[in-house]
């Protein structure tokens, strides 16, 4: 059974990594970053819902008294 020839693996993997690095660098070079990095405060609105207007009690089946 012949052995697997791995002599070219190092140069193949190295060239692949260099190519990926160059591709990612060119992608990031074209990205425009925002100039002002100030946080934007969200507009919080309070919605009135019917279940907030009254007090309700939830009865669980296990908390009912024994019959």
From Swiss-Prot:
Superkingdom, taxonomy of origin: Eukaryota
Molecular function GO terms recorded: proton transmembrane transporter activity
Residue numbers bearing the N6-acetyllysine modification: 54, 57
Modified residues (N6-succinyllysine): 54
One Gene Ontology cellular component: mitochondrial membrane
Residue intervals passing through the bilayer: 8-24
Pfam family, one: ATP-synt_8
Compartments where located: Mitochondrion membrane
Disulfide bond positions: none
Keyword set includes Transmembrane: yes
Keyword vocabulary terms for this entry: Acetylation, ATP synthesis, CF(0), Hydrogen ion transport, Ion transport, Membrane, Mitochondrion, Transmembrane, Transmembrane helix, Transport
Biological processes per GO annotation: proton motive force-driven ATP synthesis
Membrane topology reported for the UniProt record: Single-pass membrane protein
InterPro entries hit by this protein: ATP8_mammal, ATP8_metazoa
Subunit structure: Component of the ATP synthase complex composed at least of ATP5F1A/subunit alpha, ATP5F1B/subunit beta, ATP5MC1/subunit c (homooctomer), MT-ATP6/subunit a, MT-ATP8/subunit 8, ATP5ME/subunit e, ATP5MF/subunit f, ATP5MG/subunit g, ATP5MK/subunit k, ATP5MJ/subunit j, ATP5F1C/subunit gamma, ATP5F1D/subunit delta, ATP5F1E/subunit epsilon, ATP5PF/subunit F6, ATP5PB/subunit b, ATP5PD/subunit d, ATP5PO/subunit OSCP.
Membership in a protein family: Belongs to the ATPase protein 8 family.
Main function: Subunit 8, of the mitochondrial membrane ATP synthase complex (F(1)F(0) ATP synthase or Complex V) that produces ATP from ADP in the presence of a proton gradient across the membrane which is generated by electron transport complexes of the respiratory chain. ATP synthase complex consist of a soluble F(1) head domain - the catalytic core - and a membrane F(1) domain - the membrane proton channel. These two domains are linked by a central stalk rotating inside the F(1) region and a stationary peripheral stalk.
Protein name: ATP synthase F(0) complex subunit 8
Gene source species: Dugong dugon (Dugong)
């Amino acid at each position: 059974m012949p052995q697997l020839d791995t002599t070219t693996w190092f140069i193949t993997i190295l060239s692949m990594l260099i190519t990926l690095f160059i591709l990612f660098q060119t992608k990031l070079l074209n990205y425009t970053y925002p100039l002002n990095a100030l946080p934007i405060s969200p507009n919080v609105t309070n919605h009135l819902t019917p279940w907030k207007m009254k007090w309700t009690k939830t009865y669980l089946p296990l908390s009912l008294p024994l019959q």
